[in-house]
């Protein structure tokens, strides 16, 4: 049965019933198939020459159709290919959705995991899951935002809204599958589990997001620096908060990169004695001189590591690749906790090492909507902002090697508007 036939079927059923429950069911079906019909007519990302960027004015494209618009983004058409300019369609905002013109998008190491095929992805792929921009349109029933508001978006942009995780605002752990801003199935009206087309992320000039997953940006922070708060900030704030980090605690931050450097600032603002643990010489110095750590350790220096054995109350590891965590477990006090947030790869741990160094090993994934609001308020109160390097999109392909070589200071952020003003 075609979408048109399904729409006619439920429209006819709706016209022939007075049962309120059935009316609700039929309306949900109609809305779902209408939205699916819109999505079926959207063009997928495809390469375009940069010389024609000026033909795709956001203002002009937005006015051409009641249901969709042409968008520009930066992504890849297949695994391992270079990031390039792509053109594609976005739908316009419908119920409870806002349309955001993207100003700045951070480059997370996980973006590269997908681009190069270290993690499974659907192609074409437009990455980007930490972004800041301006509301340019709102759909029906939007009551939290107005046109012109400066807002930010994190990786999770939808969830079922009904399960135990969602009702406790831990939407990233939705029991029916959270939808992330890219490389995930869209949740259509009436869906419990997402069944729609693949999402495209923030390396683009516009995005449509449900208002529940949009966050007001604190006015006292710098807009060009703070896109990474929406992933790196949320991902590190959540486990630090849940560990009740505070005065009198010795806290280690392992891996001083995009996540770790923000974690140092957050843990310090929480009142802890913060020790930065890194393998990189310049970060060993910069962690204390610039980021505010009380001490730093070179993880490659056995003597330095030995001096701190058995002394940490909590360790947060942000290393974004498979590695041996035993040297860090040995730094913990008896039955203290180490939390890993960067390493989402298979890890082998010898049970004897855990037996000899009893500890709690845990992980964490981004943050729920309430914690993200808390994180933004906390960073606003303590004037915490990421240290970033602003780039244009034509430099995206250079960033992976620099990240691998620990040359980024500390997060790359794409200036989307400057990238498209050619």
From Swiss-Prot:
Where it sits in the cell: the answer is: Host cytoplasm; Virion
Q: Where does Zn(2+) 1 bind?
A: 108, 129, 231
Cite the cofactor comment: Binds 2 Zn(2+) ions per subunit.
Q: What is the source species?
A: Acanthamoeba polyphaga mimivirus
Taking the first listed entry, what is the main subcellular location of this protein, grouped into a coarse class?
A: host cell
What EC identifiers does the entry list?
1.-.-.-
Could you tell me the superkingdom of the organism this chain comes from? Viruses
Which keywords does this chain's UniProt record carry? Host cytoplasm, Metal-binding, Oxidoreductase, Virion, Zinc
Q: Is the Zinc keyword given for this protein?
A: yes
Keyword Oxidoreductase in the entry? The reply is yes
- Cofactor(s) annotated in UniProt: Zn(2+)
Q: Which InterPro entries match?
A: ADH-like_C, ADH-like_N, ADH_Zn_CS, CAD-like, GroES-like_sf, NAD(P)-bd_dom_sf
Coiled coil: which residue ranges?
none
What's the protein called, per UniProt?
Answer: Probable zinc-type alcohol dehydrogenase-like protein L498
According to its record, what are the GO cellular component terms? host cell cytoplasm; virion component
Q: Which residues bind Zn(2+) 2?
A: 160, 163, 166, 174
> Can you name one GO molecular function term for this protein?
oxidoreductase activity, acting on the CH-OH group of donors, NAD or NADP as acceptor
């Amino acid at each position: 049965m075609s979408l048109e036939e399904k729409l006619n079927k439920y429209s006819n059923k709706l016209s022939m019933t007075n049962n309120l429950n059935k009316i609700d069911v039929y309306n949900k079906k109609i809305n779902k198939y209408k939205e699916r019909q819109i999505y079926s007519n959207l063009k997928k990302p495809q390469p375009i020459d940069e010389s024609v960027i000026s033909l795709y004015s956001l203002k002009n494209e937005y006015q051409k159709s009641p249901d969709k618009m042409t968008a520009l983004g930066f992504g890849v058409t297949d695994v391992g290919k270079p990031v390039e300019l792509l053109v594609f369609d976005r739908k316009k905002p419908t119920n409870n959705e806002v349309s955001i013109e993207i100003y700045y998008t951070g480059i997370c190491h996980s973006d590269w995991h997908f681009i190069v095929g270290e993690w499974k992805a659907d192609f074409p792929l437009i990455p980007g899951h930490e972004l800041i921009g301006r509301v340019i349109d709102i759909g029906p029933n939007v009551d939290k935002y107005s046109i012109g508001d400066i807002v930010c978006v994190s990786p999770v942009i939808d969830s079922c809204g009904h399960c135990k995780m969602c009702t406790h605002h831990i939407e990233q752990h939705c029991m029916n599958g959270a939808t992330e801003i890219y490389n995930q199935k869209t949740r259509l009206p009436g869906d419990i589990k997402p069944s729609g087309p693949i999402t495209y992320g923030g390396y683009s000039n516009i995005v449509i997001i449900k208002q529940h997953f949009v966050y007001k940006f604190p006015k006292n922070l710098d807009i060009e620096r703070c896109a990474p708060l929406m992933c790196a900030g949320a991902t590190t704030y959540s486990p630090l908060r849940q560990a009740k980090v505070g005065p009198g605690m010795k806290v280690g931050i392992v891996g001083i990169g995009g996540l770790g450097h923000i974690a140092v600032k957050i843990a310090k603002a929480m009142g802890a004695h913060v020790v930065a643990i890194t393998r990189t010489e310049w970060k060993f110095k910069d962690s204390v001189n610039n980021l505010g750590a009380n001490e730093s350790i070179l993880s490659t220096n056995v003597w330095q590591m030995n001096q701190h054995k058995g002394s940490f109350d909590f360790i947060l590891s942000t290393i974004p690749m498979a590695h041996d965590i035993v040297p860090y477990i040995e730094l913990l006090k008896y039955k203290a906790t180490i939390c890993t947030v960067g390493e989402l790869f298979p890890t082998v741990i010898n049970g004897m090492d855990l037996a000899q160094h009893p500890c709690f090993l845990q992980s964490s994934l981004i943050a729920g909507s309430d914690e993200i609001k808390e994180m933004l308020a906390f960073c606003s109160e303590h004037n915490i902002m990421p240290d970033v390097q602003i780039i244009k999109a034509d430099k995206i392909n250079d960033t992976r090697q620099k990240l691998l070589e620990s040359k980024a200071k500390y997060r790359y952020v794409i200036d989307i508007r400057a990238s498209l003003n050619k």
